[in-house]
């Protein structure tokens, strides 16, 4: 076969294999025997081996897996992959529906099965698959393109030459999971606890051939750029994705109201065991994109969607002992040490006991048969005692009076249920602060997890976060299981963390009551650490959602000489102390009508998109939020303004129409 013939035949084979693969892996309706598919695949592989230049990015042979990767690159999600708020019962679902209707009126919902796998993003250019990434922290994930390419239900080429970014869930079917664990058991390897862990572990293999051997699957459940493509609803987006050749779960339903949603939830609670894959709940989304825009999002999750989690599985096991741990803020927490037991697909040996009052109220004793469940199917907790099983050998537990780490006296502050160690130099607190500082939500220092921090701390190499920026390769190589390459990578990650925006550093400092959302609000408002350090209590409380308790904690933190010294050291090492997001009041004209104002947009503007309006308001010193409250200063109402306008009228909030809005932003440009 000459090259011209080979080129024609390779194109024919790619078309045939794409069609047969789609019929088998997506439609589950194969039209040819497996042997015929394999024969055609072998023929294409032989042609590509003889003429390597004929190999294309969408060739079915690319699913077999290429050479191992050195490491996974970071990928920034243009549209964040936000997590969802949870619902645990019918009441939570009805509360969600009530909040939606208060904001946008009546709404239809789309219900989908919540696949228990790994959330991924897949990007296509002109119809060709070009990049896949993990969710990561929602803003930044890892490039797993080559591993996703091995999933046969994921199209390498779409049926239309469109550019898009889809979101989906990669998972391991139950049959594949059982087969994989049987193979690992035969080889004497550690078994995977559940299909979710197996899927996540497979997609994070540096060798794509390993991922290819694991028989993963993928359902697509969203389209990040749907509105750019002229699509107006989530249900329409799912139909469009399916028409392009994606595998979209057929077990979905558009519901006219919350009663239909609850019926769908109850139906799948019963039918769940019959599925060939694991699900842990139902995802409910407002169908209309226009209503989704109006509802907006919090810092953590969209207001237009919620994840109903199936009731947690409960099991009984023996409480062997109770361990007391000290957290980064000095809170002392009791942890149950259990006879190993499987709960919701994982082996559990430890569970939270919350606090001393909880142990006393439940009369939990060492040696008891205790009931364990996973809260939200994630955190194991002791929920009760099987008193009938007591034989008299059980031992009541008493919380210690002194810190188990530094032996300082434990105290209970007024109004709190937790015991605290108030020694700021307690080794446990210092260690936990370092772990928090390096965590994904804070400075995101890859490779600096609990084990490495503990080694560094025990070796006397670090005591506070500034010490991290003094570490050398020679010091790291001396640690257990830390080679030269690992040390180089860790130092690079520490160096990269210096460029983080202010909100990450602020959250990483571990100021009491300041979570990730509050850190974001403070960074946006003050823009530099210097301004925040100088802020008075009143200035702090002027920031939306910053209350008196948090303001007191922030001023107390910056009043400490140790905090001043720490920040000086971090500055000296080049750690960024400025907010890197969109600038607001610093660029606003002094007479801007928006300066320092909290603004809500509702309805449709004829002159610009909602995002463009938001940018204009922020340019002129305002802050845009998604819902109307007593802290709202101004509401801008376009056409078809809904319940937000009514609420603003009830609260006596100033309201502008579009013409007044345009007048002000044009004045701000002069």
From Swiss-Prot:
Biological process annotations from GO: DNA repair; DNA replication
Molecular function GO terms recorded: DNA binding; DNA ligase (NAD+) activity; metal ion binding
Principal EC category: ligase
Residues the record lists as binding NAD(+): 34-38, 83-84, 112, 135, 169, 285, 309
Protein name: DNA ligase
Species of provenance: Geobacillus kaustophilus (strain HTA426)
CDD domains linked: BRCT_DNA_ligase_like (cd17748), LIGANc (cd00114)
Pfam families with a match to the protein in the record: BRCT (PF00533), DNA_ligase_aden (PF01653), DNA_ligase_OB (PF03120), DNA_ligase_ZBD (PF03119), HHH_2 (PF12826), HHH_5 (PF14520), Nlig-Ia (PF22745)
Catalytic site positions: 114 (n6-amp-lysine intermediate)
Record-listed E.C. numbers: 6.5.1.2
GO CC, alphabetical: cytosol
Alphabetized UniProt keyword annotations: DNA damage, DNA repair, DNA replication, Ligase, Magnesium, Manganese, Metal-binding, NAD, Zinc
PANTHER family (alphabetical): CHROMOSOME TRANSMISSION FIDELITY FACTOR 18, DNA LIGASE
SUPFAM superfamilies listed in its UniProt record: BRCT domain (SSF52113), DNA ligase/mRNA capping enzyme, catalytic domain (SSF56091), Nucleic acid-binding proteins (SSF50249), RuvA domain 2-like (SSF47781)
UniProt entry tagged with the keyword Chloroplast: no
Family, per entry: Belongs to the NAD-dependent DNA ligase family. LigA subfamily.
Domain BRCT, chain residue ranges per copy: 589-670
Function (record text): DNA ligase that catalyzes the formation of phosphodiester linkages between 5'-phosphoryl and 3'-hydroxyl groups in double-stranded DNA using NAD as a coenzyme and as the energy source for the reaction. It is essential for DNA replication and repair of damaged DNA.
Catalytic activity: NAD(+) + (deoxyribonucleotide)n-3'-hydroxyl + 5'-phospho-(deoxyribonucleotide)m = (deoxyribonucleotide)n+m + AMP + beta-nicotinamide D-nucleotide
InterPro entries linked to this entry: BRCT_dom, BRCT_dom_sf, DisA/LigA_HHH, DNA_ligase, DNA_ligase_AS, DNA_ligase_CS, DNAligase_adenylation, DNAligase_N
Residues given in the record as Zn(2+) binding sites: 403, 406, 421, 426
Cofactor: Mg(2+); Mn(2+)
């Amino acid at each position: 076969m000459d090259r011209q013939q080979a080129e024609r035949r390779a194109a024919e084979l790619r078309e045939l294999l794409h069609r047969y693969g789609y019929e088998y892996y997506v439609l589950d309706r194969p039209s040819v025997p497996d042997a015929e598919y394999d024969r055609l695949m072998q023929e294409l592989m032989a042609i590509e081996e003889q003429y390597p230049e004929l190999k294309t990015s969408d060739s079915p042979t690319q699913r077999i897996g290429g050479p191992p990767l050195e490491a996974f690159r970071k990928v920034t999600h243009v549209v964040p992959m936000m997590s969802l708020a949870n619902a645990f019962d019918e009441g939570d679902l009805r509360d969600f529906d009530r909040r939606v209707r208060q904001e946008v009126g009546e709404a239809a919902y789309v219900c989908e099965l919540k696949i228990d796998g790994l959330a991924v993003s897949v990007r296509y250019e002109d119809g060709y698959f070009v990049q896949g990434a993990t969710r990561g922290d929602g803003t930044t994930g890892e490039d797993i393109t080559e591993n996703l390419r091995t999933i046969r239900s994921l199209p390498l080429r779409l049926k239309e030459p469109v550019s898009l970014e889809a979101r989906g869930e990669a998972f391991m079917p139950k049959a594949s999971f059982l087969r994989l664990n049987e193979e690992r058991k035969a080889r004497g390897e550690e078994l995977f606890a559940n299909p979710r862990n197996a899927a996540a572990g497979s997609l994070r293999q540096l060798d794509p051939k390993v991922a290819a051997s694991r028989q993963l699957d993928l359902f697509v459940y969203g389209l990040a750029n749907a509105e750019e493509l002229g699509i107006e609803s989530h249900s329409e987006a799912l139909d469009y994705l399916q028409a392009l050749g994606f595998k979209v779960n057929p077990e979905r339903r558009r519901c006219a109201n919350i009663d239909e949603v609850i019926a769908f939830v109850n139906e799948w609670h019963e039918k769940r065991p019959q599925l060939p894959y694991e699900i842990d709940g139902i995802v409910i989304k407002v169908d209309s994109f226009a209503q989704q825009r109006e509802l907006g999002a919090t810092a953590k999750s969209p207001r237009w969607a919620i994840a109903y989690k199936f009731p947690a599985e409960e099991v009984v096991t023996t409480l062997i002992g109770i361990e007391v741990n000290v957290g980064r803020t000095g809170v002392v927490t009791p942890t149950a040490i259990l006879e190993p037991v499987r709960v919701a697909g994982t082996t559990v040996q430890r569970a939270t006991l919350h606090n001393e009052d909880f142990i006393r109220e439940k009369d939990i004793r060492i040696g008891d048969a205790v009931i364990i469940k996973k809260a939200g199917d994630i955190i194991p907790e002791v929920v009760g005692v099987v008193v009938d099983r007591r034989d008299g050998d059980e031992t009541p537990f008493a919380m210690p009076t002194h810190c188990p780490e530094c032996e300082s006296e434990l105290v209970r502050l007024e109004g709190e249920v937790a015991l605290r160690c108030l020694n700021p130099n307690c080794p446990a607190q210092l260690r936990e602060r370092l772990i928090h500082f390096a965590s994904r939500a804070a400075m995101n220092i890859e490779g600096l997890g609990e084990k490495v921090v503990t080694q560094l701390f025990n070796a006397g190499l670090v005591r506070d976060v500034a010490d991290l920026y003094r570490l050398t390769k020679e010091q790291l190589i001396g640690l257990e299981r830390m080679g030269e390459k690992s040390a180089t990578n860790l130092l690079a990650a520490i160096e990269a963390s210096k460029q983080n925006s202010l909100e990450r550093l602020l959250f990483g400092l571990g100021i009491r009551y300041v979570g990730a959302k509050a850190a974001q609000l403070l960074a946006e408002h003050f823009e530099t650490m210097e301004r925040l350090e100088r802020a008075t209590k009143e200035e702090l409380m002027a920031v939306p959602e910053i209350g008196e308790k948090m303001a007191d904690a922030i001023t107390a933190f910056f009043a400490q000489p140790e905090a001043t010294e720490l920040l000086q050291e971090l500055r000296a090492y080049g750690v960024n102390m400025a907010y890197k997001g969109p600038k607001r009041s610093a660029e606003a004209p002094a007479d801007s009508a928006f300066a320092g104002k909290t603004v809500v947009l509702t309805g449709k503007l004829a002159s610009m998109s909602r995002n463009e309006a938001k940018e204009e308001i922020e340019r002129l010193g305002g802050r845009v939020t998604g819902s109307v409250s007593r802290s709202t200063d101004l509401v801008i109402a376009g056409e078809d303004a809904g319940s937000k306008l009514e609420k603003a009228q009830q609260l006596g909030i100033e309201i502008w129409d579009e013409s007044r809005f345009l007048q002000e932003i044009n004045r701000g440009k002069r």
